[in-house]
Amino acid sequence: MKKIILILIFFSSIIKVRAQQDNPSVDTAWEHIYRGSYPRINDLVHTKLAVSFDYNKSWMFGKEWVTLQPHFYDTDSLTLDAKGMEIKEIAVVKGKSKIPLKYSYDDMQLRITLDKTYKSGEKYTVYLDYISKPDELKLKGSAAITEAKGLYFINPKGETNEHTEIWTQGETESNSAWFPTIDKPDQKTTQEISMTVPSKYVTLSNGLLVHQQKNADGTRTDDWKMDLPNSPYLFFMGVGDYVIVKDKYKKMDVDYYVEKEYAPVAKKIFGETPAMIGFFSKILGVPYVWPKYDQIVGREYVSGAMENTTATLHQDGAYQNARQLVDGNAWENDISHELFHHWFGDLVTTESWSNITLNESFANYSEYLWQQFRHGKDAADELNYSDMQGYLMSESDNKDLVRFYYKNKEDLFDAVSYNKGGRILHMLRNYVGDSAFFKSLKEYLTLYKFKPAEAQQLRLAFEDVTGQDLNWYWNQWYYGSGQPSLDINYDYNNGKARVIVDQVQTTGKIFKLPVAIDVYSQGANKKRYKVWLKNKSDTFYFASLQKPSLINVDAYKVLLEIKNDHKSAEEFEQQYQYAPNYLDRREALEYFAKNKLSALANGLNDKFAGLRLFTLENLEKGKGYTIPSVLNLIEQIAVKDPNKKVQAKAIEILAKLNDSKYRSLFEKYVTDSSYSVAGAALEGLAHLEPEQAYTLAKKYSNDALGKLGEVVSGIISKNASENDFNFLLDHFKNEPLSEDKIKSAIAFAQYLLKVKNTENVKKGVDEIMKLRNQIPEQYRGYIDPVFKQLFSKISDAKKAEGNTDLSNYIDGLLK
């Protein structure tokens, strides 16, 4: 989801408005339906599956032995979730015999009458013979997961050049599309899965591969076993032509399942995993409990990644070649996120989807923890700020973190459960302190391991460790909505500095906030005061012999807030120079970008690459690069900065000047190992020497992704003929979902204006439509204006050419 949210933010920056959707009859009935924990009548104990696949029909043939027991009350019936299956047989197992059972089935649930009344603690095993037909199932997904059919056959007949794969996606309740189960997060079961597949393929599932058997028909049966209980939505199967790249954490297997061409770089993509396992085990005080940890990449995957127990599935955006990795591992946060779920989500699981933030806020916050450990506090704080902005831009002020009222459980996978939840944990860590924070997490994980939990149990763990009543915090942040909007003013009179903080949010709610305030007297000298905001307006006085050079409210920079801070230019200069945190410096640079471009240049020498990049971006927007002293610094960055993205942005700015003195610089860096740097350099050449740039674009087109891919696509599209269609189509198709692909779509659509071949135009607009359809339905109101504009231009051009049928075809795409 995080990837999708960033792309949506990019789209919103293009269109500047949020599309208004016609919705004359709004369904509000759900607002009165309480969604609590699910009644537990029967408990899963063990699930055994034997499956094989029909690749031509995209079917799975399944046999299941599911062992259960009544949760507490005696029962003579069993309800299993089983979506869109053909049921052939249901029986209760008695020794070596099977006794048929009566049942009813509505294509969603099996209601089974058992052979007798079973008492609490009395186990029984039900046998089911069935066929799963996922492609005949129609269910909606969520923002995080765009489909919900559970079992996916990718290129099953080998009709395209794509890899043939099978993979599953269970969350929220989609695994019951390929095996009958009680598909609720509060259920836990051990498991065995036997997969019979063509012998040329490898398989992956939860737990350990305990046996393999070659069969006479050219297939092989792999037996996977998981002895530790986990929830049904975490079950996984993966099948395909993968290379298994071996790694280790201590003596435990840590393997990476990738396509052959990515085997040489698999450890560069996933190789931090063993260190992450060690780091998370240490800070939590709870070792990684599972028997191994594997990661696999799936083509056409419907989410970003999924924490299937011991078998995490990543979308193909995880695939990066050596040149992409020069710019940094774009998938590192996703790797840490899914791994951390093996404590928060897999080991201790949300009791109900209403409490999904217990899984997702922790996984989100793990990204901060890892960034802080591996890349430093500035990098972590930059991520924290980015995630906070992602939440604030989602316009979710009315949503509680724990939501017992919702229309669809899929709607809970949003910027509140993830981003806001992570920020709430960050504030909690700051409030109680590191020692108490991690000790509380250890207690929570220890008390509820292999069990479901809800947010109150997390609170009780924190209260037990800290000795404090934290109901106020949970009520405000977990069971409340919104965030404070602070208006901060300062004055000084008669030896006293005064700070006035007004809470100006329009919800009428007043937040209780512990806040640190630093008062600076001279240079870096400061005194820290800890205060509470708890009124609509709070005023604080600090004795000071002279007017403070800076007063820094929220000195730790941890508050989830919207802020209007009325500092002067001189105070922001002091803040940039002496306040230590990433956000201190960023706030100052933001002020300079709007009010004092000459001071903004200070950010070009910042120790942190992210702020150097931020400075360059704002100098570009404000044309501050035209100041001679600033331009001199940018020229130095273009050749010396150790960070490739910063260097690339500097070259991009030089390209805007159309100055021939930079030609040699562009020619030098157009062959750089970084796609970002090479792309920026090629863009510069395109301004100075269009013919040379076109020749180079054609030359480099077979190895052009990211920024270089965007520039190559733009240059060739601008100059392309009808004969270049297949190249441009393939180039566009092969770009991973990203901001660069969206920019390429605009260039590709421009090219289609001059394509005359009807079938080629259809192929092109269909491919653009595929990109649009990768965005979840509920967010398309943000982006459809962009696609409509692209399609409208192409349609008008074809109508002008007299191709009315093609024009009508294009017009129908977004109706």
PLM region spans:
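Non-catalytic accessory/interaction domains
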Residues: 197, 260, 340, 448-632, ...
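Sec-dependent N-terminal signal peptides
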Residues: 6-10
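Amphipathic alpha-helical scaffolding segments comprising HEAT/armadillo-like alpha-solenoid repeats
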Residues: 565-575, 594-605, 624-639, 659-671, ...
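Acidic/His-enriched low-complexity segments
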Residues: 19-288, 415, 430-432, 448
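Hydrophobic alpha-helical and helix-loop surface patches within well-folded domains
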Residues: 3-5, 16-19, 24-28, 87, ...
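Structural detector for internal amphipathic alpha-helices that build alpha-solenoid repeat scaffolds
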Residues: 557-561, 583-594, 602, 612-625, ...
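N-terminal signal peptide c-region/cleavage motif recognized by signal peptidases
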Residues: 12-14
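Eukaryotic acidic, Ser/Thr-rich intrinsically disordered low-complexity regions
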Residues: 780-815
